């Protein structure tokens, strides 16, 4: 801030306070300009005097010079005082005629206009994320009023240039300036596009409305989708980080996150950069968020990180880089302090508006590029751009005039900030084509770049080509090291197994040598750029000729490169053994006993664990990452199980172990372990009366959950977990979704009241009964089978949900049958035989399962659907096992295949049927898959973490068998708790939370 020195100037009255603020504001702007001049190595010193204040601004050296020469300041102040006195005397001598009064009013109104204009410039600069003054484009704002919204103007005052305001309006604006703010919705449209952009303008106007409320915190997860038409299933995504490359090519489109507002703030130009209150970064940089605290990164380039849950607090979207972060009035100094930047991270987010906005921006940039490219090749009208050619021949084909730090790529790979900056610089953009013959030489590249192809296809084509180029480069350099002129295949595994005797020099910094299939696009590009200096060093050529077994698993030869999946599997097994042994000691047993984790979680008062490392709760080892597992192993001596009520766990023990427990601790008499007389074995009753039955007994069934039941306070992933709160929340959400479905079903029938949905009918006849408007990736089924994220997504999307009933008569018949089946009261058979049996086990909770005869046909259809899912799952498991070289079916990691596109390709699927888990497939699709079973084939393009491919015979390395099986199991344990598993018993569906330990 400028230095202020108090002088002895005569004080003015309080009317000058407004002008004082304007002067302070302008001096701050002057100081920002001096900082920019200092970056150009120009030195500036400035002394300003206003009333009783002396301002000293300038560069660091300039201020130091002025502060040492106090005589300069005194002389300047003295001169200003004398001139002020002369002006006052002359003012007294002049007569106050009407003309003079009018001139005074003109000066005043001009001053106020200047003040308002400067404040508008300050607000506009603040909306752009800058601390400097930015000129307001009044003409563009008035022409395209939906691009920039001005809030806080006094009621009845429209936004326009200050020169069009009268004196009273100007004063009124200055009095209410504390609430004035600019919000930039999108870049300005060109005039010709603005005339036809009614839809976009209407959308932008809707986005101006502030939300009437905000929804509660939403835990979501993300899966990659395609191009700009993306419909992210969740709001955030977990991906790897390549911090060394600022222009990492990301085929996966992320919704704005908390880091977007910080990392994507780039200046419009260096001249207006100023001092930013947040660090500038690159929008392409991806952030890795581990599921456990301080979990290390997977060493491979293609690693998949554990999924994370992101909480989004609000439901309205405003551009991250343009939104006014604080609704509080600005402080008296108009320039915001950098210290406040950290407090302005709360933003409202609405994916639909964000998606519409980024789609429109990408379309504009795509049209701009095509128009500029057509001008370069002298073609008429827009022309499709061969992006791969521009990326492969950067010296002969390139683009000039792009904003600094933005590489030329397909617009679908840019985020909103870069798209806006490109549009602002559209006049300077120019395509340079030095070799026109390149545009017609490579037809393969043009075929790979079809306009209809999505981001995934483009990414796959690009990375495949780059890997091929790098592999050819390595083969050539490897042959040179061996004294050969012909390229030779590189034994990558041997280089990894013997890093001291076989290695490569000249690779870019922080890039290890390995097979090109492990590199991402940024590293591949860097390797190609330094291809001339790459050199293979072979100290022991004999290693290349011997086929040793030690290279069959190169990633596990050294501790540094040990496979992550094998390592975490071993640690989990070790911790599991520790827990089992400690649990047995607590029961007074000598042999290890498997811990019933759900029982501990459900009874934390009577069953808990002491001595765990600080911050680590007690739960199944499959929930822990490597850091926590290692901490538990190191502190295993302190761990102690406390069992206050052994009767809670006795039913979970093996039959031979129960009799060895000290019976004094039991509160109830010991009973035989036979199934018919053991009171400790609870039996569950389920009464199935119809497809929509929801009996009290069903709701009372306790299912094992993966929640925390330890008495040790902890905060998993930053929040303290409460099973009661979670259970209450999911129960409430399920009820809301069920009520919503019932209301929509009634609307489809033309009724005002809600109608209970016959889910079995919808599942059995999907062509005649179906639901439209559900969020992408969410199938229609009972609300009880959904987790919290999907329930919340359904409620957010409730306005679009619509039930389609093509055969109302069949629907009414099903409703009547369901009603008639529920009308008679349930009768419990009281035959003498039953009474005799019940008398022997009076304390058992035995309940009959009653199935009305009318529902048998419907239940058989549901059973057929479940059988189809099992058959499809078995088919996929068998095909996947064949693809990875196994002779037996292997559980398919559906989620990992989905979030690692390009790693595993599934061919032979029926037309119109995409590959996904069987639980998400329609009945008709599953039948078509089974009909095409012989054509379906899994192909592993490149491995991903958790996938172990056995290319050797099983008997060559028998020790790999258990590891592979465990890793296959471990790869499935990464699925979050919120994944729905639908269990169908008759027509009633009971959601079971996955329990990897039982």
Curated annotation (Swiss-Prot):
Residues found modified as Phosphothreonine: 556, 558
One Pfam short name: GTF2I
Tissue: Ubiquitous.
Name this polypeptide is given: General transcription factor II-I
Gene Ontology biological process terms from the UniProt entry: negative regulation of angiogenesis; transcription by RNA polymerase II; transition between slow and fast fiber
Origin organism lineage: Eukaryota, Metazoa, Chordata, Craniata, Vertebrata
Region (Disordered): 241-341, 661-714, 816-836, 960-998
Cross-link type Glycyl lysine isopeptide (Lys-Gly) (interchain with G-Cter in SUMO1), residue numbers: 221, 991
Matches recorded under PANTHER family: GENERAL TRANSCRIPTION FACTOR II-I, GENERAL TRANSCRIPTION FACTOR II-I REPEAT DOMAIN-CONTAINING PROTEIN 1
Function: Interacts with the basal transcription machinery by coordinating the formation of a multiprotein complex at the C-FOS promoter, and linking specific signal responsive activator complexes. Promotes the formation of stable high-order complexes of SRF and PHOX1 and interacts cooperatively with PHOX1 to promote serum-inducible transcription of a reporter gene deriven by the C-FOS serum response element (SRE). Acts as a coregulator for USF1 by binding independently two promoter elements, a pyrimidine-rich initiator (Inr) and an upstream E-box.
Cross-link (Glycyl lysine isopeptide (Lys-Gly) (interchain with G-Cter in SUMO2)): 35, 86, 92, 94, 130, 140, 185, 219, 221, 325, 343, 353, 380, 435, 450, 456, 488, 494, 526, 561, 660, 664, 670, 680, 715, 816, 827, 861, 864, 879, 891, 991
GO terms assigned for molecular function: DNA binding; DNA-binding transcription activator activity, RNA polymerase II-specific; mitogen-activated protein kinase binding; RNA polymerase II-specific DNA-binding transcription factor binding
Residues with the Phosphotyrosine modification: 248, 398, 503
Lipid metabolism among keywords: no
Modified residue annotations for N6-acetyllysine: 130, 353, 450, 715
Residue spans of biased composition, Acidic residues class: 302-317
Family statement: Belongs to the TFII-I family.
Post-translational note: Transiently phosphorylated on tyrosine residues by BTK in response to B-cell receptor stimulation. Phosphorylation on Tyr-248 and Tyr-398, and perhaps, on Tyr-503 contributes to BTK-mediated transcriptional activation. Sumoylated.
Positions carrying N-acetylalanine: 2
GO cellular component terms attached to this protein's record: cell projection; cytoplasm; neuronal cell body; nucleoplasm; nucleus
Keyword terms of this UniProt record: Acetylation, Cytoplasm, DNA-binding, Isopeptide bond, Nucleus, Phosphoprotein, Repeat, Transcription, Transcription regulation, Ubl conjugation
Annotated GTF2I-like repeat ranges: 103-197, 352-446, 457-551, 562-656, 724-818, 859-953
Motif Nuclear localization signal per UniProt: ranges: 319-326
């Amino acid at each position: 801030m400028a230095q202020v020195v108090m002088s002895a100037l005569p004080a003015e009255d309080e009317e000058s306070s407004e002008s004082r603020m304007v002067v302070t504001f302008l001096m701050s702007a002057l100081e920002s300009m001096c900082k920019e001049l200092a970056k150009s190595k120009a030195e500036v010193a400035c002394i300003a005097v206003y009333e009783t204040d002396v301002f000293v601004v300038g560069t660091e050296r300039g201020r130091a010079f002025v502060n040492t020469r106090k005589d300069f300041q005194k002389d300047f102040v003295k001169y200003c005082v004398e001139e002020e006195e002369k002006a006052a005397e002359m003012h007294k001598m002049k007569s106050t005629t009407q003309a003079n009064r009018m001139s005074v009013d003109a000066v005043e109104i001009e001053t106020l206009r200047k003040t308002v204009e400067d404040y508008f410039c300050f607000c506009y600069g603040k909306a752009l994320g800058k601390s400097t003054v930015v000129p307001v484009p009044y003409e563009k704002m008035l022409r395209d009023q939906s691009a920039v919204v001005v809030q806080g103007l006094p009621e009845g005052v429209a936004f326009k240039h200050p020169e069009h305001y009268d004196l009273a309006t100007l004063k009124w604006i200055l009095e209410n300036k504390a609430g004035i703010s600019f919000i930039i919705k999108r870049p300005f449209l060109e005039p010709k596009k603005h005339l036809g952009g009614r839809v976009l303008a209407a959308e932008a106007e809707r986005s101006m409305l502030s939300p009437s409320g905000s929804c509660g915190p939403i835990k979501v997860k993300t899966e990659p989708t395609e191009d700009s038409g993306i419909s992210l299933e969740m709001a955030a995504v977990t991906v790897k980080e390549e911090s060394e490359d600022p222009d990492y090519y990301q085929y996966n489109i992320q919704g704005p996150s908390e880091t977007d507002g910080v990392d994507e703030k780039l200046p419009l130009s260096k001249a207006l950069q100023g001092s930013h209150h947040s660090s500038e970064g690159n929008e392409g940089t991806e952030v890795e968020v581990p599921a456990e605290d301080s979990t290390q990164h997977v060493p491979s380039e293609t690693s998949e990180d554990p999924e994370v849950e992101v909480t989004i607090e609000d439901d309205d979207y405003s551009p991250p880089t343009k939104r006014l972060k604080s609704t509080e009035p600005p402080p008296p100094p108009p320039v915001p302090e950098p210290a406040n930047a950290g407090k302005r991270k709360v933003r409202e987010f609405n994916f639909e508006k964000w998606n519409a906005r980024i789609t429109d921006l990408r379309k504009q940039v795509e049209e701009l590029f095509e128009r500029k490219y057509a001008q370069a090749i002298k073609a008429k009208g827009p022309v499709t751009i061969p992006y791969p050619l521009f990326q492969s021949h950067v010296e002969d084909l390139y683009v000039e005039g792009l904003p600094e730090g933005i590489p030329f790529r397909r617009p679908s790979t840019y985020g909103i900030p870069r798209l806006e900056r490109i549009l602002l610089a559209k006049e300077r953009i120019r395509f340079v084509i030095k070799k026109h013959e390149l545009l017609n030489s490579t037809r393969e590249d043009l075929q790979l770049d079809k306009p209809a192809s999505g981001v995934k296809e483009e990414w796959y084509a690009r990375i495949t080509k780059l890997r091929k180029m790098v592999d050819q480069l390595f083969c050539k350099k490897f042959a040179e090291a061996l004294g050969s002129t012909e390229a030779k295949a590189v034994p990558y595994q041997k280089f990894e197994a013997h890093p001291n005797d076989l290695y490569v020099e000249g690779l870019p910094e922080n890039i290890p040598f390995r097979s090109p299939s492990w590199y991402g696009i940024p590293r591949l590009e860097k390797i190609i750029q330094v291809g001339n200096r790459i050199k293979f060093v072979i100290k022991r050529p004999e290693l290349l000729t011997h086929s040793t077994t030690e290279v069959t698993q190169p990633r596990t030869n050294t501790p540094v490169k040990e496979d992550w999946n094998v390592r975490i599997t071993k640690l989990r097994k070790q911790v599991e053994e520790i827990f089992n042994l400690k649990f047995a000691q607590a029961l007074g047993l000598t042999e290890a006993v498997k811990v019933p984790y759900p029982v501990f979680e459900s009874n934390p008062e009577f069953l808990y664990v002491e001595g765990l490392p600080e911050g680590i709760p007690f739960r199944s080892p499959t929930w822990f990452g490597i850091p926590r597992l290692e901490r538990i192993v190191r502190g295993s001596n302190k761990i102690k199980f406390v069992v206050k009520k052994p009767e809670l766990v006795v039913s979970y023990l093996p039959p031979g172990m129960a009799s060895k427990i000290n019976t004094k601790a039991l509160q109830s008499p010991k009973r035989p372990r036979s199934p018919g007389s053991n009171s400790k074995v609870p039996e569950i009753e389920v009464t199935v009366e119809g497809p929509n039955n929801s009996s009290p007994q069903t709701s009372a069934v306790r299912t094992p959950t993966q929640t925390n039941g330890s008495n040790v306070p902890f905060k998993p992933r930053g929040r303290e977990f409460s099973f009661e709160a979670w259970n209450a929340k999911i129960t409430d959400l399920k009820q809301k979704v069920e009520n919503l479905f019932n209301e929509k079903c009634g609307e489809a029938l033309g009724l005002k009241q809600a109608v209970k949905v016959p889910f079995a009918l919808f599942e059995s006849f999907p062509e005649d009964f179906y639901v439209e408007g559900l969020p992408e990736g969410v199938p229609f089924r009972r609300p009880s089978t959904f987790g919290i994220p999907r329930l919340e997504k359904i409620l957010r999307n409730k306005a679009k949900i619509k039930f389609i009933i093509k055969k109302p008569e069949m629907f009414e018949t099903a409703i009547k049958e369901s009603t008639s089946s529920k009308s008679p009261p349930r009768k419990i058979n009281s035959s003498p035989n039953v009474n005799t049996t019940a008398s022997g086990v009076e304390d058992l909770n035995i309940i009959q399962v009653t199935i009305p005869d009318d529902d048998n046909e419907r239940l058989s259809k549901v059973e057929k659907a479940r059988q189809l899912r099992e058959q499809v799952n078995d088919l996929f498991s068998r095909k996947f096992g064949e693809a990875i070289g196994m002779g037996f079916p292997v559980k398919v990691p559906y989620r990992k295949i989905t979030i690692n596109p390009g790693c595993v390709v599934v061919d032979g699927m029926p037309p119109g049927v995409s590959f996904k888990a069987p639980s998400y497939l329609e009945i008709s699709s599953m039948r078509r898959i089974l009909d095409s079973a012989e054509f379906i084939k899994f192909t592993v393009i490149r491995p991903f973490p958790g996938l172990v491919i056995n290319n050797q015979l099983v008997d060559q390395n028998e020790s790999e068998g258990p590891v592979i099986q465990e890793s296959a199991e471990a790869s499935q344990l990464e699925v979050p708790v919120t994944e729905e598993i639908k269990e169908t018993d008759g027509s009633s569906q009971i959601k079971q939370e996955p329990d990897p330990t039982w």
